[in-house]
A protein has these predicted regions:
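Non-catalytic, conserved peripheral segments adjacent to functional cores
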Residues: 1-92, 104-134
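Glycine-centered loop/turn positions within well-structured domains
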Residues: 101
């Protein structure tokens, strides 16, 4: 497991404690202080080698937790940043507005991604801007 938390390119990265036994694995995708600020949540299953994201938000912060394996990429003023989340680990990413982000499932089974947004979901895509980076 990597350091418990760090920041890279404006994105806060935190490794989470995963509890596993013969039944499966459990982790908390968002911490209590951040939970109160969230206005929507979605759970995403991503198939092997598929990519999700490829966008940024004009105003919203996004808190995304992935259960690896997964390649997480984001682009900020300093360029592209890549993080490989190992299989069986849960990592949380706090992504500020204006930072493009994307996720690729690098495994052989469905990847779980849980994402929280600081703004309510807008089906018209008002706060979400397409940005192909992966």
């Amino acid at each position: 497991m990597r350091p418990a938390s760090t920041t890279a390119g404006g994105v806060e990265i935190e490794t989470l404690r995963v509890h596993s036994d013969e039944r499966g694995s459990l982790f908390e995708p968002v911490d209590e202080p951040a939970l109160a600020a969230q206005r929507n949540v979605h759970v995403v299953l991503t198939w092997p080698n598929a990519v999700r994201g490829n966008h940024y938000h004009r105003e919203a912060w996004e808190v995304t937790t992935v259960f690896g394996p997964c390649l997480v990429r984001w682009r900020d003023a300093d360029g592209l940043h890549d993080v490989d989340v190992p299989a069986g680990e849960a990592w949380r990413f706090r992504i500020p507005p204006g930072v493009a982000h994307a996720y690729r499932n690098t495994g052989t089974t469905a990847m779980v991604l849980v994402s929280f947004g600081s703004r309510p979901h807008d089906p018209s895509g008002g706060d979400t801007v397409s940005a192909a980076i992966l």
